[in-house]
């Protein structure tokens, strides 16, 4: 093979500079000719739909042909003295370099020195080559096949043109020319046969750098550039600097059509595909500013509502799982920004200032944690307790099902209190409730902060209206991810009350259980919106709704009632006095489960129940149940009892109401149709020691109730029942269990290990066909 070239008339560099930057038909320098033993022609490269991955490096054969200027140099460059060298070439941002700089590639080849890139093919030889025209010669690259040759060709063309665009757009002179070049750059990226993230990101980064270095552009120039790069944003996130530019445009021109026509699909893509705003916070900020810009339109929140509807979709289930978490993240960050002025300034932060003055003596503040409520010293705590005896104190009663914040006065019974450690961090609700000044203080936000707060709280309301989003929304808001200043702000808690009400009205346990605290020692929405809580602005209607839904689910437990008796007995009695049916039921259960030991308090509860028709009716039913219970628990009757198969809860209730079962020790309900509802009857059997629930529909709710009342149970068979870890964990309170059958249940290995550690008398365990097997 003999390929030579000569530099004929005309300066090829001048020709290159005068050609359009994105010319698709690039011809070689004038006068260049290829000489050899066989004719050589330029290969006509047609993509025909082929796609290629952008090369960053690869192995290829290299040959450099210098343009002969003398007869001797022409002999030296003849085909007899020419050789091919293998090199591992790297396509850097500004040059083509070899991993082993030697021979032909001892020096890297700058993209600015490459005048032309063309594919070559020979008729009589299966060679696949590229010709790189450089000053004074030609660089030939030989690939193994035509696909690799084309891949190298497109990759080199891309690197070369991107390098030139970076130089051209780094020093703009006339903006109409710059805009034309940007459009051409975008077209090049869209029509490139290369597939790589950088194909679209590189032009965006070039434009982003251009905008960051030229801040004196007019509004019209801003919009023209945004429209020009819009096609690239359809499938790509904007770079950080470009996000900042978009944010500025949203703030300065919220009514611009660019916001609706260009930014809407960009924000939709961000909400659908973004996985972590922590890695790209400017995307979140851009989304926030876009939503605020929509809110500034004439229709205001109606436009925002339509946008949320478009994100959810027309069906009952949103097909994009990332939309809700991303929207919530945007709302939380926006709400935090509303109180940022208070948070960053002690003097202008009445919430923190008043909390410190009311709860603690002045103490040093950690400079790295300006929002942290510091741990009080034991001496300061004792001094405060001496100075304010009647002050409310915080006590936590915790269970595996529910954690309720208990407030006690100095006259409450010490038997029901549980002390917290002196080294624990002050409870948020205590801090907001302990000082009278905190209850009357008001936080005033500026006009812009007020609009931001109202807009994003309204979005949370809209999100809570979607049934499929409500479980995830409740889970995300369960830890109360709002600043302390927001919880002290009456406007915020009043607006957010709608969201909490939606949670309280949802019958799904996964939703309304999120009203409770996320773990022991922390506060939940149940505490904030209960009477006496910092966010309670009514007479307990929301509190009654929350208690009603929790009692109707699986929280009708002695621990839950004990917590209410300790914490909210007064509000419960007041609401029952006003005819609230749920509160009347609560008071009856307190009497039935012997939660209240004080006789005077019991008489007061009875008087409260008898003061209303609904309460009187429930109390009469309670008295009837108590008489039946005494008859049921009267000594006598069988010691063993087996119900026929297919028996139901009603059959069991009818049987137990027919006589005395005070001696019943062994009850078999195997292969019956009983459910968790029968637990209310089983807990009335005082002598029960063995219970067989094999192949029944007895579930977690019933298991939790049994664990609280039948603490003397010794043998329990749960084989082939639908119980899960949520119910099985409650068995840890049955210290007398000797035999436990959990065959074919949804028992996990961790729960099994936990039960073994907490049940010291357990000797026989069946965990076959479970995860723990």
From Swiss-Prot:
<feature type="repeat" description="LRR 4">
    <location>
        <begin position="736"/>
        <end position="756"/>
    </location>
</feature>
<feature type="domain" description="PH">
    <location>
        <begin position="54"/>
        <end position="163"/>
    </location>
</feature>
<keyword id="KW-0677">Repeat</keyword>
<feature type="repeat" description="LRR 1">
    <location>
        <begin position="663"/>
        <end position="686"/>
    </location>
</feature>
<dbReference type="GO" id="GO:0001701">
    <property type="term" value="P:in utero embryonic development"/>
</dbReference>
<dbReference type="Pfam" id="PF23066">
    <property type="entry name" value="PH_21"/>
</dbReference>
<keyword id="KW-0433">Leucine-rich repeat</keyword>
<keyword id="KW-0597">Phosphoprotein</keyword>
<dbReference type="InterPro" id="IPR056429">
    <property type="entry name" value="PH_CMIP"/>
</dbReference>
<keyword id="KW-0963">Cytoplasm</keyword>
<dbReference type="GO" id="GO:0005829">
    <property type="term" value="C:cytosol"/>
</dbReference>
<dbReference type="GO" id="GO:0005654">
    <property type="term" value="C:nucleoplasm"/>
</dbReference>
<feature type="modified residue" description="Phosphoserine">
    <location>
        <position position="660"/>
    </location>
</feature>
<feature type="repeat" description="LRR 2">
    <location>
        <begin position="687"/>
        <end position="707"/>
    </location>
</feature>
<dbReference type="InterPro" id="IPR052813">
    <property type="entry name" value="CMIP"/>
</dbReference>
<feature type="modified residue" description="Phosphoserine">
    <location>
        <position position="377"/>
    </location>
</feature>
<feature type="region of interest" description="Disordered">
    <location>
        <begin position="1"/>
        <end position="28"/>
    </location>
</feature>
<feature type="modified residue" description="Phosphoserine">
    <location>
        <position position="382"/>
    </location>
</feature>
<comment type="function">
    <text>Plays a role in T-cell signaling pathway.</text>
</comment>
<protein>
    <recommendedName>
        <fullName>C-Maf-inducing protein</fullName>
    </recommendedName>
</protein>
<feature type="repeat" description="LRR 3">
    <location>
        <begin position="712"/>
        <end position="732"/>
    </location>
</feature>
<comment type="subunit">
    <text>Interacts with FLNA.</text>
</comment>
<dbReference type="InterPro" id="IPR032675">
    <property type="entry name" value="LRR_dom_sf"/>
</dbReference>
<feature type="modified residue" description="Phosphoserine">
    <location>
        <position position="349"/>
    </location>
</feature>
<keyword id="KW-0539">Nucleus</keyword>
């Amino acid at each position: 093979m003999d390929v030579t070239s000569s530099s004929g008339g005309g300066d090829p560099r001048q020709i290159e500079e005068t050609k359009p930057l994105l010319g698709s038909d690039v011809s070689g320098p004038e006068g260049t000719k290829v000489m050899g033993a066989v004719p050589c022609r330029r290969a006509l490269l047609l993509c025909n739909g082929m796609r290629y991955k952008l090369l960053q490096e690869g192995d290829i054969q290299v040959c450099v042909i210098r343009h002969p200027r003398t007869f001797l140099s022409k002999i030296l460059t003849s085909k007899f003295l020419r050789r091919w060298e293998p090199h591992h070439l790297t396509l850097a941002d500004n040059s083509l370099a070899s991993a082993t700089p030697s021979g032909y590639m001892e020096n890297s080849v700058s993209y600015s020195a490459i005048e032309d890139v063309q594919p070559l093919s020979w008729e009589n030889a299966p060679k696949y080559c590229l010709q790189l025209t450089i000053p004074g010669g030609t660089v030939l690259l030989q690939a193994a096949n035509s696909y690799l040759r084309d891949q190298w060709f497109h990759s080199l063309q891309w690197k070369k043109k991107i390098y030139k665009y970076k130089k051209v757009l780094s020093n703009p002179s006339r903006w109409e020319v710059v805009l034309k070049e940007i459009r051409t750059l975008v077209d090049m990226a869209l029509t490139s046969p290369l597939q790589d993230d950088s194909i679209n990101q590189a032009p965006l980064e070039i434009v982003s750098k251009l905008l960051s270095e030229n801040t004196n552009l007019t509004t019209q120039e801003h919009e023209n550039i945004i429209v020009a790069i819009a096609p690239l944003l359809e499938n790509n996130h904007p770079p950080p600097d470009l996000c900042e530019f978009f944010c500025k445009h949203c703030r300065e021109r919220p009514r611009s059509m660019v916001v609706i026509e260009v930014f809407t699909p960009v924000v939709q893509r961000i909400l659908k595909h973004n996985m972590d705003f922590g890695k790209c916070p400017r995307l979140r900020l851009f989304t926030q500013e876009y939503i605020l810009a929509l809110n500034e339109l004439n229709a205001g929140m109606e436009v925002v509502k339509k946008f949320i509807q478009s994100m959810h979709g027309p069906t009952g289930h949103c097909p994009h799982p990332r939309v809700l978490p991303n929207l919530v993240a945007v709302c939380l960050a926006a709400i935090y920004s509303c109180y940022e002025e208070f948070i960053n300034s002690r003097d202008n932060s009445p919430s923190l200032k008043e909390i410190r003055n009311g709860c603690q003596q002045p103490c040093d503040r950690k400079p790295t944690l300006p929002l942290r409520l510091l741990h009080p010293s034991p001496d300061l705590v004792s001094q405060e307790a001496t100075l304010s005896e009647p002050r409310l104190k915080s006590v936590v009663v915790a269970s595996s099902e529910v954690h309720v914040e208990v407030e006690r006065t100095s006259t409450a019974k010490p038997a029901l209190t549980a002390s917290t450690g002196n080294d624990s961090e002050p409870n948020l609700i205590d801090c907001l409730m302990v000082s009278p000044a905190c209850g009357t203080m008001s936080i005033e936000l500026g006009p812009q902060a007020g609009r931001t707060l109202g807009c994003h709280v309204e979005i949370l309301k809209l999100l809570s209206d979607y049934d499929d989003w409500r479980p995830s929304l409740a889970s995300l808001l369960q830890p109360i991810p709002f600043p302390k200043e927001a919880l002290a702000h009456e406007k915020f808690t009043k607006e957010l009350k709608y969201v909490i009400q939606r949670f309280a009205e949802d019958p799904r346990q996964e939703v309304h259980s999120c009203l409770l605290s996320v773990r022991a020692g922390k506060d939940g929405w149940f505490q904030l919106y209960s009477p006496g809580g910092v966010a309670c602005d009514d007479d307990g209607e929301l509190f009654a709704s929350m208690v009603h839904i929790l009692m109707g689910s699986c929280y009708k437990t002695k621990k839950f009632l004990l917590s209410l008796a300790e914490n909210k007995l007064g509000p419960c009695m007041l609401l029952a006095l006003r005819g609230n049916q749920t509160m009347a039921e609560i008071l009856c259960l307190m009497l039935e489960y012997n939660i209240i030991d004080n006789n005077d308090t019991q008489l007061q509860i009875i008087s409260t129940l008898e003061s209303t028709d609904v309460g009187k009716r429930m109390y009469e039913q309670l008295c009837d149940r108590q008489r039946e219970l005494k008859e049921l628990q009267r000594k006598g009757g069988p010691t063993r009892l087996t119900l026929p198969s297919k028996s139901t809860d009603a059959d069991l209730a009818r049987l137990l109401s027919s006589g005395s079962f005070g001696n019943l020790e062994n009850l078999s309900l195997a292969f019956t149709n009983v459910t968790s509802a029968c637990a209310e009857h089983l807990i009335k059997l005082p002598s029960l020691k063995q219970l067989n629930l094999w192949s029944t529909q007895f579930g977690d709710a019933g298991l939790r109730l049994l664990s609280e009342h039948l603490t003397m149970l010794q043998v329990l068979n749960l084989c082939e029942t639908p119980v899960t870890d949520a119910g099985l964990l409650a068995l840890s309170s049955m210290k007398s269990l000797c035999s436990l059958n959990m065959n074919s249940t949804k028992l996990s290995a961790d729960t099994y290990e936990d039960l073994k550690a907490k049940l010291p008398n357990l000797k026989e365990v069946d965990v076959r066909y479970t995860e723990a097997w």
